[in-house]
UniProtKB/Swiss-Prot annotation:
Substrate binds at K163, S192, R249. This is Homoserine O-acetyltransferase. The gene is metAA. Pathway: Amino-acid biosynthesis; L-methionine biosynthesis via de novo pathway; O-acetyl-L-homoserine from L-homoserine: step 1/1. The active site is at C142 (acyl-thioester intermediate), H235 (proton acceptor), E237. Keywords: Acyltransferase, Amino-acid biosynthesis, Cytoplasm, Methionine biosynthesis, Transferase. It is an enzyme of class 2 (transferase). Transmembrane segments: none annotated. Pfam families: HTS (PF04204). HAMAP family: MetA_acyltransf (MF_00295). It catalyses: L-homoserine + acetyl-CoA = O-acetyl-L-homoserine + CoA. It comes from Oceanobacillus iheyensis (strain DSM 14371 / CIP 107618 / JCM 11309 / KCTC 3954 / HTE831). The record marks E111 as: Important for acyl-CoA specificity. It is found in: Cytoplasm.
C-alpha cells in the first residue's frame, strides 16, 4: 500500500523514480480504507533528505499511511527554507488536539549538549509527554532514542572517546520478538554519533528490553515492554551515500573525522560504499507499523 503525502512535496518525485508507491490526497480519498496516521518530528538539519529517507521505507509496507510533518516552534531551522517548512510542516499547537497511530522522532546533531541545554528541550519534553496518551507507538532514532531514554526512563547518554562512525555488525538477542521478525541473527547498521548509552543500565531497567547490540557500536535496538517506545541508536534509514556525505561535510568544515569504519571498499573514499542494511530497515519499519501500530491502534480513537 502507498504512503499518502502532500501532492507537491519534493520527495514525491524522488520516491516515484525509485518505484516507491506514493499517493497524493486527491487519489487517497477514493480508497475506502482508514490510513494509519503517522507524525514525523523531523529534527535533522537537512529536512528534505530525511523526509525522503523515511518515506522510502514507510511506503514499502502493505498498509496505507498518512504522513504529517512536525517542527519545533522553539527552534529556527537554518538549512531548510521557510517556504518548505510553512508548506509541509505543522507546529505542536496545531496537532496536539489530534490522535496519531504512530510517531517518529528523528536524530539531531545536538548530542554534544546536555539535554537541558538544547534550545527546544522543553518543547520536546511536552511532545513526548503528550505522546503517552495520544500516540500508539513512537519510533525514536539516534539522538531521538537517547532523548527518549533520558526523558522516559532516566538513562543518560555519555560521551565516547571518539566518534562511533561507520557500518557495524549487530547481534540479534531476542529473535522471536515481533519487532525483529525476519531479521538475520547478525546484521549490519550505520552509526554516526559521539555519545552512547549504557548496556548495563538498559538491561537493568524493568520496562526495557534490549533487542540488538554490537561489540563495536554498543546498544542498537531496544523497546519498552509495552511497545510504546521503540529506540534505534543508529541510522538504518540512511541511504548508501549518507555516511560518505557526512564524512566529506566534516572535512570541508575542518573537522578531522576518521574514515567511517567498514564502509568504503578498501577504506578508499573514492569508491562506492556497499549498501548492506536496506532489507533490515524495511523489516524494522514494516514490523513496527504492523505489530506495534496497526495491530494495537483503535480503528476509531476513543473506543
Amino acid at each position: 500500500m502507498p504512503i499518502k503525502i502532500p501532492i507537491h512535496l519534493p520527495a514525491k518525485d524522488i520516491l516515484e523514480k525509485e518505484n516507491i508507491f506514493v499517493m497524493d490526497d486527491q487519489r487517497a480519498i477514493t480508497q475506502d480504507i482508514r490510513p494509519l496516521n503517522i507524525l514525523i518530528l523531523n529534527l535533522m538539519p537537512e529536512k528534505q533528505k530525511t523526509e525522503t529517507q523515511l518515506l522510502r521505507f514507510l511506503g514499502n509496507t502493505p498498509l496505507q499511511v498518512h504522513i504529517s510533518f512536525l517542527r519545533m516552534s522553539s527552534h529556527e531551522s537554518k538549512h531548510t527554507s521557510k517556504y518548505h517548512l510553512d508548506t509541509f510542516y505543522k507546529k505542536f499547537e496545531e496537532v496536539k488536539s489530534k490522535k496519531f497511530d504512530g510517531m517518529i522522532i528523528t536524530g539531531s546533531p545536538v548530542e554534544h549538549l546536555p539535554f537541558e541545554e538544547v534550545d527546544y528541550w522543553k518543547e520536546l519534553q511536552d511532545i513526548m509527554n503528550w505522546s503517552k496518551e495520544n500516540v500508539t507507538s513512537t519510533l525514536h532514532i539516534c539522538w531521538g532514542a537517547q532523548a527518549a531514554l533520558y526523558h522516559h526512563y532516566g538513562i543518560d547518554k555519555h560521551h565516547l572517546p571518539q566518534k562511533c562512525f561507520g557500518v557495524y555488525e549487530h547481534k540479534l538477542l531476542h529473535p522471536h520478538e515481533r519487532l525483529v521478525r525476519g531479521f538475520d541473527d547478525y546484521f549490519f547498521a550505520p552509526h554516526s554519533r559521539y555519545t552512547d548509552v549504557s548496556i548495563s543500565e538498559i538491561e537493568a531497567h524493568p520496562d526495557l528490553q534490549l533487542l540488538a547490540k554490537s561489540d563495536d557500536a554498543g546498544v542498537f535496538l531496544l523497546a519498552s515492554k509495552d511497545g510504546k517506545h521503540i529506540m534505534a541508536t543508529g541510522h538504518l534509514e540512511y541511504s548508501a551515500e549518507t555516511l560518505a556525505e557526512e564524512y566529506l561535510r566534516d572535512h570541508q568544515r575542518g573537522v578531522d573525522t576518521a574514515i567511517p569504519e567498514n564502509y568504503f571498499p578498501d577504506n578508499d573514499p573514492k569508491k562506492q560504499p556497499k549498501y548492506r542494511w536496506k532489507s533490515h530497515c524495511s523489516l524494522l519499519f514494516s514490523n513496527w507499523l504492523n505489530y506495534y501500530v496497526y495491530q494495537e491502534t483503535p480503528y476509531q480513537w476513543g473506543e
